[in-house]
Amino acid sequence: MRNCCRECGLSAGHLEPEASSNCASDVKSSPDMDSVSSQDSLYLPNTVGASLEDQDLWSQFHQEGTEMIITKSGRRMFPQCKIRLFGLHPYAKYMLLVDFVPLDNFRYKWNKNQWEAAGKAEPHPPCRTYVHPDSPAPGAHWMKDPICFQKLKLTNNTLDQQGHIILHSMHRYKPRFHVVQSDDMYNSPWGLVQVFSFPETEFTSVTAYQNEKITKLKINHNPFAKGFREQERSHKRDDVLKILQQSPSKRQKRKKWEDSPEADISDFPKAICVKEESIMDPAGVYQNWVSDHEANQGLTPHSPESEGANQEQQVPTSSSNFYNKSHYRRSSQHLSSPFELGEPSSRRLTPDIATVPDSDPDSLAVFHVIPTQNSAPERTCSMNFSMEAPMKQPLRGAMYSPYGADQWLVPAQGQYRPVGYTAYPTDLSTQGAVAHPHSAMSDWSQYSLFPYSCW
């Protein structure tokens, strides 16, 4: 047939009526074509055809009014454009193209569960044609399997540079499928064979679905919308309802538990920590151990200054310190040393207060004074306690300093040579800076080796 067409000087896609009739008569009268089967007639240009795949699905959407989403970045169609071709020459190369044309010159709107015209259509955007990525390909390739345009995308961006089909929202369109015979997309001339369109593929372009029935059809049939299936939604609703039904009872149980004594017991360790950190008021039971200067300041057990002063552990310099082993084991974890506090003991303006064990005040009414010992090796720091096994110890008497009471007497003027420095950074008018003499002394044991604690 192609040889016959070449002899006539015309291409197969542009046969004139007379030439085509002559060629047909030549084909019939040629003895070489007697063995041509009826299948060869499918290769003739006027016998090329196409059919729509998934026609039942398209028909369901068409009955409700198909809607296609368009976005700025481009959105694929569902149902997809899928056709099947037949009647092509198996060895000739063809190209497949798709374009979209408006159905009318109106703009539409969704009103009362139906589409209705809402004015004149907007100017049509530049017409774009989508070329199937397999083009060009032999006819046998196109006829082998259904042809799917799954990578086709619709957009409403008039400045799109990705090759997507540009459409206007709320307008009606239909796709057209072009079959073009060509060996090369750019160089060889195109020979138009056929154009196909199907009424089931007509749709309205939207940016959001207007018809709920279309939404349900998309959810039920689109494989990429499995998370939106109505069945899964019903299960989720049931789960939510169960949770909501159980929530009031759970709240009541929670409220009952909070009101019960168990909730108070759960916070008991926290209260214990607060009690352990509290320090006994030195001006309460043991008022005789507080100096006048500290009493004038009016420190209370809840005062930060009183708490900070009582938590320090000092070397015995200007007062006696009283400790008990059982009390030390209980409170040593909460008291920090002067090195940890980062404050030297010489900066304390108030005398040291001895901490006594938590016991009945009546049992401490009588104290036995330990005889004064002046030997230097026996002078110890108030922190030097023997750590014994943690067991209940009997109540012991208070530990007094090995220094005698005569050490607190202020020497007369001129008896000793004054030292040029003092233990306090500033001159205190109320107490005065007492300088410790270090010369002309017969007994060094009753005085400290240093004017301030350095341990």
From Swiss-Prot:
* Induction or repression: By mesoderm inducing factors and TGF-beta family members including nodal/nr-1 acting in an autoregulatory loop, nodal2/nr-2 derriere, bFGF and activin B.
Annotated segments matching region Disordered: 21-40, 229-262, 295-346
Instruction: State a single Gene Ontology molecular function.
Output: sequence-specific DNA binding
Query: Where is the protein situated, by its record's location annotation?
Result: Nucleus
Main subcellular location of this protein, as a coarse class: nucleus
Q: Annotated DNA-binding ranges?
A: 57-230
Q: Which GO terms describe its biological process?
A: cell fate specification; mesoderm formation; positive regulation of DNA-templated transcription; positive regulation of transcription by RNA polymerase II; regulation of DNA-templated transcription; regulation of transcription by RNA polymerase II
Q: In which tissues is it expressed?
A: Uniformly distributed in stage I oocytes but becomes localized to the vegetal hemisphere by stage II and remains so thereafter throughout oogenesis and the early embryonic cleavage stages. Zygotic expression parallels blastopore formation and shifts from dorsal expression in the marginal zone of late blastula and early gastrula stages to a ventral/lateral expression at the posterior end of later stage embryos. Expression is excluded from the notochord. In tailbud and tadpole stages, expressed exclusively in a subset of posterior Rohon-Beard neurons.
Q: Where is the composition biased (Polar residues)?
A: 308-324
Keywords assigned by UniProt? Activator, Developmental protein, DNA-binding, Nucleus, Transcription, Transcription regulation
Regions of compositional bias (Basic and acidic residues) in chain numbering: 229-241
Q: Looking at the UniProt record for this protein, which Gene Ontology cellular component terms does it annotate, in alphabetical order?
A: chromatin; nucleus; transcription regulator complex
Q: Which domain of life is it from?
A: Eukaryota
The cross-references to PROSITE patterns, in alphabetical order and at most eight, read:
TBOX_1 (PS01283), TBOX_2 (PS01264), TBOX_3 (PS50252)
| Miscellaneous comment text of the record | Was named Antipodean by PubMed:9012537 because of its localization to the vegetal hemisphere of the egg.
Known function: Transcription factor required for both mesoderm and endoderm formation in the embryo; signaling determinants and concentration levels may determine which germ layer is formed. Acts together with beta-catenin to activate genes that are responsible for mesoderm induction including wnt-8, eomes t/bra, siamois, mix1 and sox17. Directly binds to promoter DNA. Patterns the mesoderm along the dorsoventral and posterior axis. Activates siamois gene transcription when alone or in combination with beta-catenin, but inhibits siamois transcription in combination with pou5f1.1/oct-25.
How does this protein assemble? Forms a repression complex on the promoters of the nodal/nr1 and siamois genes with the maternal factors tcf7l1/tcf3 and pouf5.1/oct-25. Interacts (via C-terminus) with tcf7l1/tcf3 (via N-terminus). Also interacts with the other POU-domain transcription factors pou5f1.2/oct-91 and pou5f1.3/oct-60.
Give the protein's recorded name. T-box protein VegT-A
Q: Which organism is it from?
A: Xenopus laevis (African clawed frog)
